[in-house]
Amino acid sequence: MILPTVFDPEEIDYFDIDRQHSHEFYVPVKGSKKRILSNLGPTNIHHVLYTRCLNYLDRKINAVDVGCRDGEFTRYLTWSFPNVYCFDYRKSLYFAGNVSLQAVTHYTVALGATQSQELGSGRNNFRNPVFDAPYQKRKLKENTQDTILPLDSFQLPEVNLIKIDVDGMEEEVLKGAVETLEKYQPVIVIEELIMADGLPNHDGIKFLSDLGYEEVFKIESQKTHRDYIFVKK
């Protein structure tokens, strides 16, 4: 059984309620554990997608953020949803400073098609062949692995929206959430990256279409980066 994440007090101390309805987020300083405040502005991709999603929701009860990272999308979800369930196999140093922990339930676990054990890379892409330093040490010296679970195993109630941004495992996440999708028909926000060979990094878009979902919004912020909103027909 996976218990919710417990954040360190020093991480929580960075939280400021006055920033919760702003676009200011703590972001990492490359190459260090330091953090700086950055104003992403209302046109940032997370806010644009969040705002668009509201057009397709008649109720706002429970949202799910898969690949929540530093809480850049999560915070916006807390503006509308009383309950937000967040998943990331890495515990971010910045999440608790960006998001009110009273509004979310965070799990430090990867989501996939079935329950399994696998060593993640420490990067956004769980299976990136290049490991971050702490994960490289685990790979070489420790007999520890990361847990992967299907979303359906959490039996979350009345899910209205699911956002998935996991750099390649999107289809696997969807396969592990079929019961939830069929029962609640949530709005889906999903990222797709175009690889060097011109192909997408996952087949989640086709999987959603096969489940009877249709694309209602698409934004291509870069030539290799697409985000979609899907709703059940």
Show the residue positions of the predicted features.
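Phosphate/nucleotide-binding beta-alpha loop and adjacent structural elements of enzyme active sites
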Residues: M1-K233
